[in-house]
Amino acid sequence: MLDSVTHSTFLPNASFCDPLMPWTDLFSNEDYYPAFEHQTACDSYWTSVHPEYWTKRHVWEWLQFCCDQYKLDANCISFCHFNISGLQLCSMTQEEFIEAAGICGEYLYFILQNIRSQGYSFFNDAEETKTGIKDYADSSCLKTSGIKSQDCHSRTSLQSSHLWEFVRDLLLSPEENCGILEWEDREQGIFRVVKSEALAKMWGQRKKNDRMTYEKLSRALRYYYKTGILERVDRRLVYKFGKNAHGWQEEKL
């Protein structure tokens, strides 16, 4: 579907386009400069415009930023699929992003949807943004592959690299918990943060970030609503493990 839409709608000069050409090669290939013939020197940078109003140049600036900021492999991203306007980009489905950019498509789709819903404040905390993006891709890969991850993390060392796993392991480690977290409904996976700043301090020490606050930590936790790792609970400081979280259930005999 994506190919047919791309070649018939997005690219009027598609016959000259190599579909395997990385988009980064565009700037060194004069054949493709006409795509930007209406671009002027005074055009604004992509962060000053809502994604639906991006020009083709804005789309490319955004791709360049994502590759630089999140270490994505630009060679995986096909130029032909992204020689489009912001409105066309926003209409692409997650499956089309994956078809156009492979595993990078997972990340790009997540970033774009967060920009559309949160604005550019999404990038205010690079550490939290990278955590959210990585966990989104991890959970998506888990879902699409159909492979259930094994609970191979140590419950006492709390060395988990993801925030939600850190919280899970802390709940399962009373000797480390010290009353910071407590179960409200163990069977349903519902828990409460009792000592919010203590939790933030412990996570900050884990990540070597002495500026960590609960406000930042809770923002990172909310990213997990999008991935199905956590579910929203309409009570302050209360969270629930979602369908894509694993390792928190009590073992049934």
Curated annotation (Swiss-Prot):
GO terms for cellular component: cytoplasm; nucleus. This is ETS-related transcription factor Elf-5. PROSITE patterns: ETS_DOMAIN_2 (PS00346), ETS_DOMAIN_3 (PS50061), PNT (PS51433). Residues 33-119 form the PNT domain. Coiled coil: none annotated. Keywords: Activator, DNA-binding, Nucleus, Transcription, Transcription regulation. It comes from the Eukaryota. PANTHER family: ETS, ETS-RELATED TRANSCRIPTION FACTOR ELF-5. It is found in: Nucleus. Belongs to the ETS family. The gene is Elf5. Pfam families: Ets, SAM_PNT. GO terms for molecular function: DNA-binding transcription activator activity, RNA polymerase II-specific; RNA polymerase II transcription regulatory region sequence-specific DNA binding. GO terms for biological process: ectoderm development; ectodermal cell fate commitment; mammary gland epithelial cell differentiation; negative regulation of cell differentiation involved in embryonic placenta development; positive regulation of transcription by RNA polymerase II; somatic stem cell population maintenance; trophoblast giant cell differentiation. Residues 161-242 bind DNA. SMART domains: ETS, SAM_PNT. CDD domains: SAM_PNT-ESE-2-like. The PNT domain acts as a transcriptional activator. Transcriptionally activator that may play a role in regulating the later stages of keratinocytes terminal differentiation. Binds to DNA sequences containing the consensus nucleotide core sequence GGA[AT]. Transcriptionally activates the TK promoter. The keyword Manganese does not apply. InterPro entries: Ets_dom, ETS_fam, Pointed_dom, SAM/pointed_sf, WH-like_DNA-bd_sf, WH_DNA-bd_sf. Expressed in lung, kidney, stomach, brain, ovaries, tongue, bladder and mammary glands.
